[in-house]
Amino acid sequence: MRTDSGVWLTVVAHMIVGVDEAGRGPLAGPVVAAAVLLCEGGIAGLDDSKKLSARRRGALESAIRAQCRWGIGEASVEEIDRINILQATFLAMTRAVEALGFEPAEVLVDGNRLPRWRYQARAIVGGDALHPCISAASILAKQHRDRLMIAAAQDYPAFGWESNMGYGTAQHLAALRRHGPTPHHRTSFAPVAQLQLV
């Protein structure tokens, strides 16, 4: 494998990839997954993205992108509504792993459910706080999705997506009742679906 600013693990048996997602619960926006193969030696300070400040996440994201092999996958709002959020999450995870450009020896996934993959995989509850490769994936997934929602907020400022990232906060729900759903909303999610029945 190619060497850049980090030294890639070249032994197939060591190609253990971490996968995590961001955005299963929001009412708006895609679900995003990231897959990360850490460079040899790892990156100091990795942790569950939810436990890190925005500034720290940003610094770690830069290090991960520069020093690790990584892939990002998304499943759109349309895919979420068509196949459900769990299957859309698995689809995003699959796309993230495929974006790596190689077949890993094993994939460690945060959570208790796994996609149907041809390669070996393990679901690990709380894995984003236990395994650095999953921690790195959680950081990339959150940072990537946050940027998507901040960009979408420019077209729909009333919903406050630049701060709530599509989650059902009081501001978001009030704007949803006032303005109705946007193309970014998940119509299969109850708060949005109920408005469409009124």
From Swiss-Prot:
InterPro entries: RNase_HII, RNase_HII/HIII, RNase_HII/HIII_dom, RNaseH-like_sf, RNaseH_sf
Catalyses which reaction(s): Endonucleolytic cleavage to 5'-phosphomonoester
One Gene Ontology CC term in the entry: cytoplasm
Record's subcellular location: Cytoplasm
First-listed, main subcellular location of the protein, grouped into a coarse class: cytoplasm
A Pfam family it matches: RNase_HII
EC number, UniProt record: 3.1.26.4
Cofactor dependency: Mn(2+); Mg(2+)
Family recorded in the similarity comment: Belongs to the RNase HII family.
A GO molecular function held by the record: RNA binding
RNase H type-2 domain segment(s): 14-198
Domain of life: Bacteria
Keyword Metal-binding annotated: yes
Gene: rnhB
Name recorded for this polypeptide: Ribonuclease HII
Disulfide bonds: none
GO biological process: DNA replication, removal of RNA primer; mismatch repair
CDD domains: RNase_HII_bacteria_HII_like
Chain positions recorded as a divalent metal cation binding sites: D20, E21, D110
The record's free-text note on cofactor binding: Manganese or magnesium. Binds 1 divalent metal ion per monomer in the absence of substrate. May bind a second metal ion after substrate binding.
Keywords from the UniProt entry: Cytoplasm, Endonuclease, Hydrolase, Manganese, Metal-binding, Nuclease
Function: Endonuclease that specifically degrades the RNA of RNA-DNA hybrids.
Annotated source species: Sphingopyxis alaskensis (strain DSM 13593 / LMG 18877 / RB2256)
